[in-house]
């Protein structure tokens, strides 16, 4: 029988692809529902709250995982079991994300949107592994990885004194759109 109630976020896949984002989503939703304590050691949550948390967590598991953890009745035990099974992913995701960040270059992307998307994918992976890239690091990464033929352009953007990464990206997007319009007219 299929689940008729709507999922608040994507269920945890048995293949472990979405574990890190699933953990974050589960923690946020449990906290919003007042059930965040149910997945913390030595919690004082009521039996009813633990049951609600367990229902919520099981509802957001792949069918195969539900079967595998069928006998687990406590939300904390389920949380610890899943953590033990999947938490090692940080050891594989973190080095790959660091490598991608180190080798990320603005010049390698055709559009600002494409570059920006990759920046946020990498920084999100790093953040999920408890490693944060600051806005000034994102600014510097972007400005220092312009193509060598665009050094004057890089200096012009640097002279604008952007304090936020989003401001730089907005400016780059606007300039890219203007450039596209000029190219269409010629």
Where are the regions a protein language model picked out?
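N-terminal Lys/Arg-enriched interaction segments
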Residues: 1-186
């Amino acid at each position: 029988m299929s689940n008729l109630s709507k999922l608040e976020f994507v269920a945890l896949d048995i293949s472990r692809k979405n574990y890190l984002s699933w953990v974050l989503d589960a923690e946020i939703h449990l906290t919003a529902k007042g059930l965040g304590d149910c997945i913390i050691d030595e919690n004082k949550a009521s039996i009813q709250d633990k049951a609600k948390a367990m229902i919520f967590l099981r509802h957001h598991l792949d069918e195969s995982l539900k079967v595998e953890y069928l006998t687990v009745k406590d939300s904390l035990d389920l949380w610890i079991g899943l953590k033990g099974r999947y938490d090692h992913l940080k050891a594989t995701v973190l080095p790959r994300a660091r490598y991608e960040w180190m080798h990320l270059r603005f010049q390698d992307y055709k559009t600002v949107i494409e570059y920006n998307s990759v920046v946020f994918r990498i920084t999100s992976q790093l953040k999920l592994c408890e490693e944060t890239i600051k806005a000034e690091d994102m600014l510097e990464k972007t400005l220092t990885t312009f193509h060598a033929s665009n050094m004057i352009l890089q200096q012009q953007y640097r002279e604008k004194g952007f304090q936020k990464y989003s401001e730089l990206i907005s400016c780059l997007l606007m300039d890219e759109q203007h450039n596209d319009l000029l190219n269409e007219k010629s």
